[in-house]
Amino acid sequence: GTENAIFSVNNTYLEILAPRAKGAGADFVNSVIDADGEGLAGLALETSDIGRLKKELSERKVPTKKIVSGAGLDSQQNKSRTWQNLFFSRDLTRGLFIFAIQHESEKLQKSEVSRSTIDRLDHVVVHTNDPDGFVSLYRDKFGIKLSLDQTVEKWGGRMLFFRLNRTTIEVIGKLEKDGIPTDSFWGLAWSVSDLKAAHRRLTDVGVEVSNIRDGRKPRTIVCTVKSHTRGVPTLLIEQLDR
């Protein structure tokens, strides 16, 4: 029930969905837009063996739904792709739309990358009011590596960094649990090889971009994309030690 546009980068892909017909997919997209407007709707975690993943999660007492198959058709190239999904309840994921996916067809073709284009997803930002509960789910149950857990005294909060597939789930929260455990997506940070070239290219085509500035991470420079992001806070980042 949806029309999808897929943008492939080195370590993941961004999938944009729009409702086009009746069906569960269209119902989901419409519900997200009705509730929050356009923006970041969900996170897909790839697995090479979705049946084994479901079994392992069951052994860890993690409730899962049935594995469901999906298919998509590229009407322009007359190509199809197939996959299997394992969805998790919003009660488990504390409000986030999270699911596991196993691709059955060939890998998506990567886009041609120049120094002024995005080469990979650097990190996705999530807000939480229950950092300990987030660690319990994503590290202890999902098995995602927690690389760093730090307290930031400057603003009285806590930051968690989960690493997988050359990207990071960056979690920002309060020091202690506050109310009903709730997580929410915030934004995306994309890595580029040459931020000045990317900034110039975007400005030339009418995209509003902030001035380049030093990033919070040492030896990085960043800029904020301020238009055309469809409600998704978007940062571009260059690692200066490449």
Regions found by a protein language model. Give the residues of each.
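Acidic/polar active-site rim loop that often engages polyanionic ligands
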Residues: 34-39, 62
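Extended intrinsically disordered, low-complexity coil regions enriched in Ser, Thr, Gly, Ala
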Residues: 1, 18-25, 51-66, 132-156, ...
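N-terminal beta-strand motif that seeds the catalytic metal site of vicinal oxygen chelate
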Residues: 38-45, 99-135, 185-188
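Aromatic-anchored, glycine/proline-accented short structural segments
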Residues: 114-173
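Vicinal oxygen chelate
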Residues: 15, 51-117, 153-154, 160-163, ...
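An N-terminus-focused feature that recognizes amino-terminal "leader" regions
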Residues: 1-23, 237
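A generic, well-ordered mixed alpha/beta core segment in the N-terminal half of proteins
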Residues: 39-50, 55-57
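ER-lumen resident redox/N-glycosylation machinery signature
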Residues: 21, 25-34, 176-178
